[in-house]
Amino acid sequence: MNKVYLVAVLVLFLALTINESNEAVPTGGCPFSDFFCAKRCKDMKFGNTGRCTGPNKTVCKCSI
């Protein structure tokens, strides 16, 4: 029973990891949150502020 439980937990963990990694890929350059997007905009001198937009918040939009 313990082996079955361990295999089930590993499969669930693997499925969640694969699902999460597909959504977390920053396709337009938006890292994790609006704060990091704004920091990236300032560091790269694209603008003063930035926020994540798009259907899954994967695009970082910078503005002056």
From Swiss-Prot:
Tell me where it resides. Answer: Secreted
A single Gene Ontology CC term? extracellular region
What keywords sit in the KW lines? Disulfide bond, Ion channel impairing toxin, Neurotoxin, Potassium channel impairing toxin, Secreted, Signal, Toxin, Voltage-gated potassium channel impairing toxin
Q: Does the keyword Signal apply?
A: yes
What family does the Swiss-Prot or TrEMBL record give for this protein? Belongs to the short scorpion toxin superfamily. Potassium channel inhibitor family. Alpha-KTx 11 subfamily.
> What's written under domain?
Has the structural arrangement of an alpha-helix connected to antiparallel beta-sheets by disulfide bonds (CS-alpha/beta).
- For this entry, the protein name equals Potassium channel toxin alpha-KTx J123
In its UniProt entry, the species of origin is given as: Olivierus martensii
